[in-house]
Regions:
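Membrane-interface interhelical linkers
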Residues: 1-32, 36-71, 81-91, 139-176, ...
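Membrane-helix interface/capping residues of multi-pass secondary transporters
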Residues: 30-31, 93, 119, 200-203, ...
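Hydrophobic/small/kink-forming positions within alpha-helical transmembrane segments
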Residues: 15, 46, 73-78, 104-109, ...
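Juxtamembrane helix-start motifs in multi-pass secondary transporters
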Residues: 33-34, 96, 203-207, 268
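Residue-level recognition of transmembrane alpha-helices
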Residues: 37-38, 100, 123, 127, ...
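Structural signature of transmembrane alpha-helices in multi-pass secondary transporters
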Residues: 10, 41, 100-103, 180, ...
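Transmembrane-helix signature of multi-pass solute transporters
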Residues: 43-48, 106-110, 129-136, 216-220, ...
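C-terminal transmembrane-helix exit sites in multi-pass transporters
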Residues: 105-125, 135-137, 141, 277-299
Length: 337
């Protein structure tokens, strides 16, 4: 249950981050955003590990663990984030979200193949419900493409401007959505390998390693001519929201790494998908003038939360709470592979 709760906290923070990034890219570029949101994780995780007394754990990681955590950082914070930003800019969040569900399948397949984890009927039900929740929302939005429920609220002067008609670049958006799914799908498995079941505290040290590797990798991008000048020209409004996003990403990843250290990937990753639903609420709060809002949000939220509960509950807990017939007990105890 703890792993599931931490995964939900991670999903909420990640969704808030998405809404913040959406505001930032109204006046800032992808490179400018990554130049702020990637490096900011290093001092934040350093402080968290130092305060909790887990900084020394960095030196205790095996070479394999260091390699796995470093690879996770590059795949998630650099590759996945860049592709996600590109896809969102090309086709918008509503079209990106259902395509990125592919990363869940990548994670589950790799977890079963490499980590020896398994599926149970409860996990399969939970996965199905979590995938169904966002699908309900996306299908509803697709059914009424002409509707655009936009709030009259004005948060900044940018909101006073009527947004231009959005022309999706489908090829670019779909390609980068799938590419981001590979990064986001592979990184949880690498984190699980790197943490080696060492507990919540050590996960903070693992996050520090991942962010250092990601920052070093992204620093190579800034060596390209003109990139440093471009970053220093970041708009003040964009810099504010990118910085806020960086803090939200830190909390999101901190909760995620803690969840991965105490719960199976097959539980944490699907629950983390709830961020797709949370972002609709945060978008309404932060971006009333710059997002498209569909219906069926409450239904989708309830369906996905039921899936999260199914994933968090163990078979033993269900059997202790409900008087089940022998045939049902046998079904619940089924495992694959």
């Amino acid at each position: 249950m703890l792993g599931g709760l931490l995964a939900i906290c991670s999903a909420a923070c990640f969704a808030f981050n998405n809404a913040s990034v959406r505001r930032a890219v109204l006046t800032g570029s992808i490179v400018q955003g990554m130049a702020i949101t990637v490096p900011i994780g290093v001092p934040l995780f350093f402080i968290a590990a130092l305060v909790t007394g887990n900084l020394a754990a960095v030196m205790g990681f095996s070479p394999t663990a260091l390699a796995a955590l470093s690879a996770a950082g590059v795949m998630h914070f650099v590759w996945g984030r860049y592709c996600n930003y590109r896809a969102t800019r090309a086709i918008g969040t509503n079209l990106v979200a259902p395509i990125q569900q592919f990363n869940l399948l990548v994670t589950l397949v790799l977890a079963i193949w490499l980590l020896g984890e398994y599926l149970t009927p409860l996990k399969i039900l939970g996965i199905a419900l979590i995938l169904l929740g966002p699908t309900v929302t996306m299908q509803k939005a697709k059914a009424a493409p002409g509707e655009r429920a936009v709030s009259d609220e004005k948060i900044t002067p940018i909101d006073a401007e009527k947004p231009a008609a959005f022309q999706p670049k489908y090829a670019e958006g779909y390609i980068f959505s799938l590419l981001s799914a590979t990064g986001y799908g592979l990184s949880p498995v690498l984190v699980r390998v790197g943490l080696e079941n060492q507990g919540i505290g050590v996960s903070l040290a693992g996050g520090l390693v991942a962010y250092i590797a990601a920052t070093a990798a992204f620093a190579l991008v800034l060596l390209w001519p003109g990139q440093w000048k471009h970053v220093w020209e970041t708009d003040r409004e964009a810099a504010k929201w990118f910085t806020f996003s960086g803090f939200l990403v830190f909390f999101s990843q901190m909760f995620l790494y803690m969840a991965m250290s105490v719960a199976p990937v097959t539980v944490v990753s699907p629950i983390n998908r709830l961020s797709i639903l949370f972002r609709l609420f945060f978008s309404r709060l932060l971006n009333p003038q710059h997002e498209v809002f569909g219906g069926s949000v409450i239904l989708a939220t309830v369906v996905s939360l039921l899936g999260a509960v199914a994933l968090s509950l163990s078979t033993d807990v269900v059997q202790s709470l409900l008087p089940l017939p022998e045939s049902m007990v046998t079904l619940l105890n089924w495992r694959w592979p």
